[in-house]
Amino acid sequence: MFIDEAKIRVKAGDGGNGCMAFRREKFVPRGGPSGGDGGRGGDIVMESTQRHNTLLYFRYNPEHKAERGEHGMGSNCTGRDGKDIILKVPVGTVVYNAESGELLHDFQQPDERLIVAHGGRGGRGNQHFATSTHQAPREHEMGYPGEEFTLRLELKVLADIGIVGYPNVGKSTLISRISAAKPKIADYPFTTLEPNLGVVTVGEMPHEETFVVADIPGLIEGAHEGAGLGDRFLRHVERTHLLVHLVDVSDASGRPDPVADYKTIAAELANFGGELEDKPVIVVASKIDSVNPDKLKKLAAMAKRRKLPFYEISAVTGQGVQQLKYAMAERVRELRKQTQIEL
């Protein structure tokens, strides 16, 4: 888990100005005031969604300004209201006023809505200022300004997917391929000393989806008892939706049996306890750019026997990475729906 933060500036739309106008029609030489009111400025609205689970969008888009209302017109025509801006935030986002520190809202369920900045009221046209003794008023109101705030967004991010496997099987290279994360990568075990989190984006705005992958530091036999980098990293996997288990099928690993490698790590996950043993798994044959065909065949047969999804990739050349990325996105989407139903 890590804390994702973003600071944004929101400005609701100003109200439109009221109009000063008089009725001018044939045979009506002294028409009364007919100035319409200005439209209301657009609000800035936050809405929680399960389609995203990071604040990455707000890091790159810190300024949000709603449309102002249109000015009033003659013939008592009111100006059009400004369009609201809907900002989609992940469930779990906490919103603070950055200047006062006041907690504004904690989005705990999907589809919650909060107006974080109200649009300004439109000004009144001169029709409102007519009286029995003042029948041709020239007064009219300017629109009122929309609210403007600096907000701080905070989100506790949990990885959707944990990438597991022996040290040096290509986990860090994979996460650098499918996300913007830049983990330290080298050809020796335990390069990764802390979990690396990467945000993966699939699709394009406004329909893009994101999910978070955690590159869990290499596990070895006895990890649940603290061997290698210890059981503290297994705790990072505990709250993920899905495991992607990388197995080296090249000769570089120095280990002759990929099925034994898979079973060793699977046993460590099971021995740790909790729900790790029952998590959905995608099996991935890694380093197929220098594949040992016998190893690949053995691993594929094992995955088929266990009815587990199976993919072949080379994170170095990119072969098979896109197919795996979209399979991960589809599985996360399904698991999020299941979780929502259970809740």
Swiss-Prot record:
**Nucleotide-binding keyword on record:** yes
Q: What domain of life is recorded for the organism?
A: Bacteria
GO molecular function, a single term: GTPase activity
Q: What class of enzyme is it?
A: hydrolase
SUPFAM superfamilies (alphabetical): Obg GTP-binding protein N-terminal domain (SSF82051), P-loop containing nucleoside triphosphate hydrolases (SSF52540)
Domain OBG-type G per the UniProt entry, residue ranges: 159-333
The entry's localization annotation reads:
Cytoplasm
Question: Cellular component GO terms, alphabetically?
Answer: cytoplasm
What is its cofactor?
Mg(2+)
Gene3D superfamilies to which the protein is assigned, alphabetical? GTP1/OBG domain (2.70.210.12), P-loop containing nucleotide triphosphate hydrolases (3.40.50.300)
Q: What is its main location?
A: cytoplasm
Q: Domain named Obg: which ranges?
A: 1-158
Q: Which residues bind Mg(2+)?
A: 172, 192
In residue numbers, the region (Disordered) covers 121-140
Stored CDD domains: Obg (cd01898)
Keywords linked to the UniProt accession? Cytoplasm, GTP-binding, Hydrolase, Magnesium, Metal-binding, Nucleotide-binding
Summarize where GTP binds, as residue positions: 165-172, 190-194, 215-218, 286-289, 314-316
Q: Which Pfam families match?
A: GTP1_OBG, MMR_HSR1
Q: What is its EC number?
A: 3.6.5.-
In terms of PANTHER family, this protein maps to: DEVELOPMENTALLY REGULATED GTP-BINDING PROTEIN-RELATED, MITOCHONDRIAL RIBOSOME-ASSOCIATED GTPASE 2
Q: What does the record give as the function of this protein?
A: An essential GTPase which binds GTP, GDP and possibly (p)ppGpp with moderate affinity, with high nucleotide exchange rates and a fairly low GTP hydrolysis rate. Plays a role in control of the cell cycle, stress response, ribosome biogenesis and in those bacteria that undergo differentiation, in morphogenesis control.
Query: Which NCBIfam families did the record assign?
Result: Obg_CgtA, PRK12296.1, PRK12297.1, PRK12299.1, small_GTP
Into which family does the record put it?
Answer: Belongs to the TRAFAC class OBG-HflX-like GTPase superfamily. OBG GTPase family.
Q: Which protein is depicted?
A: GTPase Obg
Q: What lineage does UniProt assign to this protein's organism?
A: Bacteria, Pseudomonadati, Acidobacteriota, Terriglobia, Terriglobales
